[in-house]
Amino acid sequence: MRSIRSFANDDRHVMAKHSIIYPSPEELEAVQNMVSTVESALKQVSDWIDEQKCTKIENGSPIKNESTEDSSAKDESGKVLCGVMRIGLVAKGLLIKDDMDLELVLLCKEKPSTRLLTTVAENLPLQIQKITEETFQVEQCVEESSLLIQSSKEPKLTLKVILSSPLFREEEERPGGVENVAMKDPPDLLDRQKCLNALASLRHAKWFQARANGLKSCVIVLRILRDLCNRVPTWAQLKGWPLELICEKAIGTCNRPLGAGEALRRVMECLAFGTLLPGGSGLHDPCEKEPTDALAYMTVKEREEITHSAQHALRLLAFGQIYKVLQMDPLPSNKPFQKYSWSNSDREGSCLKRPFDDGSSDEKDPNKKLKRNLSKILDSKPIDPNQPMNALMRLNQIRPGLQYKLLSQSGPVHAPVFTMSVDVDGTTHEASGPSKKTAKLYVTVKVLQAMGYPTGFDTDLECLSSDEKSDSEGKNETSFSSSSNITGNSNADNNTLEVRTQGPILTASGKNPVMELNEKRRGLKYELISESGGSHDKRFIMEVEVDAQKFKGAGPNKKVAKASAALAALEKLFSGPNAVNNKKKKIIPQTKGVVSTAVSAAVQAARGRGRVAMARGAFVGATAAAAPGYIAPGMRREEMHPEIFNGYAAPYAYSAATPAYGIPKRMVLLPVMKFPAYPVPHYSFF
């Protein structure tokens, strides 16, 4: 299946060709004026004929009775000319330049005769003069059962008025085709087949207005194919009613609206499939009661030639050469990513391809082939810091074609350090990071800062893991401090923080905010509150509840928004005067020895990865649950704390967590003791 972009390119070419072949507003206005004038004049002619008929009846029968009055009323109710209807291109809206055939059908009560045609032709110019000052030439064409009306002003238009009657159709539908004896045809009756064709055209116009006019791109494709039929002799036999049926079937059977380019391709597919060939599906005429083939007039050779031409056109469409099918010049490439319009001086003399450079120039810049005149544009258009692009994208706009080089890779396998460099105007900038992408981003920010551009860009670091983000600051010599990395504000009312940074979001201690908050309050749940913006500028808001308080964070992706929410919670609850009161509360169960509390703290310190558990004392409550403690063998309780343990002996080296005499329930116990030199076991009892 072709991509949407190729269909969009086809749409551009089809619509450009359609604008070329579509009539000008002056031509459409002239068509409307001419058709409206002739319709009004024919109505005046109908009234004049009825008046003449009534006058003859009155002169032929001066004595009137009730029966004659009734008959005259019936004659007045049934006029000689019943009405005028638009058919063909005017009714269907398929007019194109150099192909503006205007047709009307004048319906008569009785079968039209040559005498009636002459009467209308003689009186029509007189009625036209009463309506408009413009002159029209009216010619009588008995062979075609019609009148030809030509305009005298530019553009030159020709309107064909065909006389017909519904009696021809009724006569065809009668069994045997026997006409009523009382109704005899006039001797100068007009051509029967021409009148039947006019009635068929009237049915075609009504069917087209009901079925094809509502289909998207159907009328546009029909105008394009009508132009193709005029240009290519092979397609001339398909012009008209069969072409309209094929387009309606091809476009109407799709389960979704089609663009102009895709609709044209679908019609070509139906023709290339072999619909017209003998033994194919054929083309049924929906406006006939009996099964009728709309392609019965075409020969086998003509069908094969049209099928072959459609197959060739379909190949051209598949290879993006629709301009050859339409016989037009290819349109210039329409690049959606080009956001800036070039000036007239830059546009003149420019070509689609990059000019050939033989290297004879004295410039020593290796990137001269890739540079563009963006410096003038950036000087005229200041950089918007709110634009959703990171530092790498912005530097690529300012200086396209920069070459980033990997200088070195150091560190262990599990924690490598990459050093990237870039040369800008003879100055080499270097930066390190835990990955090539991060190092490249850091050196880009460094270059932008050196050039004096603001660096408050949104950066998408989805590919970086949280561990990589938290470790990168400790390993990178050129990493920025937390005060320069984090540019945001926390609101005390709604506890919302939005961080805009070019690197990973870190706390003051150099850790990931989510990890540090998880150390202080485990089991937190982050929820997505809202998601806004388009596909190129997303905005996510995450919320987390800590100690019955809700904190929100916003960012270009969920990970950044989550880190922003965690950072807001840390700044509100664990910074400044609230840091001591809101530290993580580890409830130590009641043990059978004070030594066990200290030993357990030491064990926790030995197990943790640099997390010193002895930084604060363990809170011992009076309601704590009992748990066993650990006492090194060979040590007596009385030797460690005789002021506490004397008189409170317990079997199996267990003792109470607190002495018998009263002490505060929330007292912090800081025992002074000597720990054994041998290793502490790697387990704890809480």
UniProtKB/Swiss-Prot annotation:
**Basic and acidic residues: compositionally biased ranges:** 345-368, 466-476
Question: Which keywords label this protein?
Answer: Cytoplasm, Developmental protein, Differentiation, DNA-binding, Repeat, RNA-binding, Spermatogenesis
Residue spans with biased composition (Low complexity)? 477-491
**What biological process terms from GO does the record include?**
cell differentiation; spermatogenesis
The answer to whether the entry has keyword Cell membrane is no
GO CC annotations, alphabetized: cytoplasm; precatalytic spliceosome
Q: Known Pfam families for this protein?
A: dsrm, DZF_C, DZF_N
Q: In this protein, which residues make up the domain named DZF?
A: 5-360
Region of interest called Disordered, as start-end residue ranges on this chain? 339-368, 464-498
DRBM domain mapped to chain residues? 387-453, 509-575
The family database entries (InterPro entries) matched by this protein are listed as: dsRBD_dom (IPR014720), DZF_dom (IPR006561), DZF_dom_C (IPR049402), DZF_dom_N (IPR049401), NT_sf (IPR043519), STRBP_DSRM_1 (IPR044472)
Please tell me where this protein is predominantly located.
cytoplasm
GO function terms (MF aspect): DNA binding; double-stranded RNA binding; single-stranded RNA binding
Where does this polypeptide localize? Cytoplasm
Q: This protein's superkingdom? A: Eukaryota
Query: Which Gene3D superfamilies does the record associate with it?
Result: 1.10.1410.40, 3.30.160.20, Beta Polymerase, domain 2 (3.30.460.10)
Q: What does this protein do?
A: May be involved in spermatogenesis and sperm function. Binds to double-stranded DNA and RNA.
Report the protein name in the record.
Spermatid perinuclear RNA-binding protein
Q: Which organism is it from?
A: Xenopus laevis
